[in-house]
């Protein structure tokens, strides 16, 4: 039986609707670049630029490790920042523009993998590493503001719905449109357009952001101790493992969709836009029902477990689909499950930050979101390794002009089985998550008492 949510009757909202919308709009600045990289980077460098598949898989793994390691470092620096503008906002003000310039260069590779594979690989590493370092800092600063600006459960789920309505737009742009725009305009122009939209969204949203007084005055915890305190936190460890499995499942979906539509469904790759758009629109439409009928009646833990179950079951339909109509319907089914995961991801992590605040007296959102980014990012390495291990066994070779018929089954398997396994493991892990029922209610009460002192 679902546990009734003890957090829905909390303190009145402390932010305005305008502030919540502005904060949410800025989410486009994170979503568009990351979704574009997740959805089409591998396709661009293998199928279009002809980087050998094994090289690409290894490069993505190295990139994922780098991305993982820089997350806690950036989070720690964000927590320690002291400035007139606060701890988080300066990073958004000054790094957003160079971040988007670096993103645009990802899609301007001047080398071909058949003639100059070494140079193409070097270019891949340089531009991707520069972009990723800047993007990690800005995204960590952005998400660290969420538990500080929005203090109670209803306010957080409200802003989460808004963020994810915006995120649906970002998913449509960043993950669904590349197949069309890259064909019509070319990859370089596509990258410039995406960078401009993301940059504008972040700067539009910054005026609605604020930091609460007092948190910047807290004494900083040394890096070693901060890492230790984070990694021994049971609530954090269980959530971040589940989140990693979530991003593994969704990474499979976005990475494989263009291959799946081309080689399994037999459709033009541009149908990827329609199938992903269908999934994201379904997710956007499902956000309100998820919040109203499930999240407001169940705790974050229960809601998240239900969302994993729906996502895992729906992934099976991708393996069974034949023809574009069935593939699109299957994608819509997956989108309904994703809506629950999208809604609760930042909300459940905010509860972890609250618990740590009560326990240590420190507001360490940067470290938690940074460490979360470190571990979650490893999911992309796992996706790349599964792709690199599985698809050559079904005959996929990026150097071939025509792929063998066996790749059909390979991509059906790639799109379904890993996601089912990931979602099942996530549910098992969340069974050990301690912030529910009486414990969660105690944390909320203690935090409210501290704020009222």
Say what each PLM segment does.
Residues 2-453:
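Membrane-embedded alpha-helical bundles of multi-pass transporters/translocases
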């Amino acid at each position: 039986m679902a546990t009734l949510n003890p957090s829905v009757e909390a303190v009145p909202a402390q932010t305005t609707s305008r502030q919540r919308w502005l904060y949410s709009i800025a989410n486009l600045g994170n979503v568009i670049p990351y979704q574009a990289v997740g959805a089409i980077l591998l396709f661009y460098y293998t199928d279009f630029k002809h980087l050998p598949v094994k090289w690409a898989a290894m490069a993505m793994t190295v990139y994922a490790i780098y991305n993982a390691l820089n997350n806690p470092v950036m989070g720690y620096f964000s927590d320690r920042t002291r400035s007139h503008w606060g701890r988080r906002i300066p990073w958004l003000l000054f790094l957003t523009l160079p971040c988007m310039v670096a993103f645009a260069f990802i899609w301007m590779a001047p080398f071909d993998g058949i003639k100059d594979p070494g140079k193409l690989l070097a270019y891949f590493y340089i531009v991707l590493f520069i972009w990723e370092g800047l993007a990690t800092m800005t995204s960590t600063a952005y998400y660290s503001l969420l538990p500080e600006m929005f203090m109670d459960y209803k306010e957080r789920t409200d802003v989460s719905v808004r963020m994810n309505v915006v995120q649906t737009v970002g998913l449509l742009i960043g993950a669904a449109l590349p197949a069309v725009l890259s064909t019509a305009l070319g990859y370089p122009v596509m990258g410039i357009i995406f960078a401009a939209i993301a940059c504008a969204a972040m700067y539009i949203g910054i005026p609605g952001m604020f930091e609460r007084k007092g948190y910047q005055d807290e004494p900083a915890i040394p890096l070693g101790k901060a890492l230790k305190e984070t990694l021994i936190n049971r609530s954090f460890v269980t959530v971040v493992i589940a989140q990693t499995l979530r991003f593994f499942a969704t990474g499979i979906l976005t990475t494989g969709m263009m291959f799946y539509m081309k080689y399994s469904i037999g459709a033009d790759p541009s149908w990827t836009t329609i199938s992903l758009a269908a999934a994201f629109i379904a997710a956007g439409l499902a956000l309100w029902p998820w919040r109203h009928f499930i999240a407001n009646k169940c705790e974050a833990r229960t809601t998240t477990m239900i969302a994993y179950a729906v996502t895992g079951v729906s992934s099976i339909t991708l393996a069974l689909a034949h023809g574009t109509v069935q593939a699109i319907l299957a994608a819509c089914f997956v989108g309904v499950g994703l809506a629950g995961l999208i809604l609760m991801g930042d909300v459940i992590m905010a509860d972890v930050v609250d618990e740590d605040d009560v326990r240590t007296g420190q507001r360490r959102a940067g470290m938690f979101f940074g460490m979360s980014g470190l571990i979650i990012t490893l999911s992309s390495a796992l996706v790349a390794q599964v792709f690199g291990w599985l698809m050559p066994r079904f005959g996929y070779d990026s150097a071939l002009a025509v792929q063998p018929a066996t790749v059909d089954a390979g991509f059906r398997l790639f799109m379904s089985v890993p996601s089912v396994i990931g979602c099942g493991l996530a549910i098992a892990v969340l069974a050990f998550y301690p912030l529910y029922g009486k414990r969660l209610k105690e944390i909320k009460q203690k935090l409210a008492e501290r704020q009222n002192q």
